[in-house]
Amino acid sequence: MGQKVKSADAAVIGKVPSVEHARMTRPVRPNLGAGALTSYGFAIQAAIGRRPMRYLVGRRFIDHSAVTALFVLQPQILAGSHVWITEDSARRECDVETHIPTMRNSVRLVERYLFDCLPLTDIGYLDLMAWRYPGLGATPEDVEVDMSWSRWPAAEPRCYLGPVTTPGLTVTEAVDHETGMVVARAVERLRQPLRRWEVVEMGGPEVGGLPERVRASRVRNGGWTDFRRVGEPVPVPQEAFDAGPARLRETLERGLSGKAA
């Protein structure tokens, strides 16, 4: 059965807002936050069949801005690739750049590609962002959504229309009431599922719930890919992010030595 998603503006003017309305309008915590750490890195591993995949992730928060970097260590065909995401939640800005070793320069992704995945993986660009992509609708839509596939039945689904560059696209995010975190996400076009992502195992309070394990799926391909965090996040000097991708990767490799080798 689908769940009815209520708009954040659905409370009747002049009445005391309901508990459900208060939940709907409550701010959502940043994705992949690590508690008190504001500049940090962690390692991830996964596998598609017998092909291992290993990544390093760096994240820095400064006020209302965030920088997120993902570096591919394996598979070998993608080794040396990276994704660089810069966000400013106050200005509602988000830029995503990708680089693979065969490129002379990094490429800034146009908006319609931001709802897809890194090449040869199930890692979605949306899943790496600190906040909901600003090009989505400002408030949830009053529509039926199907989140029956998710292991978070009590989480509150919020469905947002995609930008004009992606007609018919919607993104539904399910928010856990206890933590305020997005724990499941579905991307659909014309009501047909394209991608799904969800938290499988939440991290402890000492790391702000940074997931221990998530899974993702390109629905048309069938099956799920499990991504596991290897060890705890480590502090990273903020200036390492200003030095550019190559220097940041070196810093992450030193700090996470042995966790994603």
Which residues are covered by each model-predicted region?
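N-terminal mature ectodomain segment of secretory-pathway/periplasmic proteins
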Residues: 9, 15-102
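Catalytic cores of nucleic-acid ligases and guanylyltransferases
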Residues: 2-7, 101-103, 107
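Eukaryote-specific, intrinsically disordered low-complexity regulatory segments in nuclear proteins
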Residues: 135-137
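Gly/Pro-enriched, hydrophobic low-complexity segments
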Residues: 71-75, 86, 95-99, 105-110, ...
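Positively charged, low-complexity intrinsically disordered regions
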Residues: 4, 55, 60-61, 214-219
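Short, low-complexity, Pro/Ser/Thr/Gly-rich segments in the mature regions of secreted, periplasmic
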Residues: 246-260
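Short, low-complexity, intrinsically disordered N-terminal peptides in bacterial proteins
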Residues: 1-16, 261
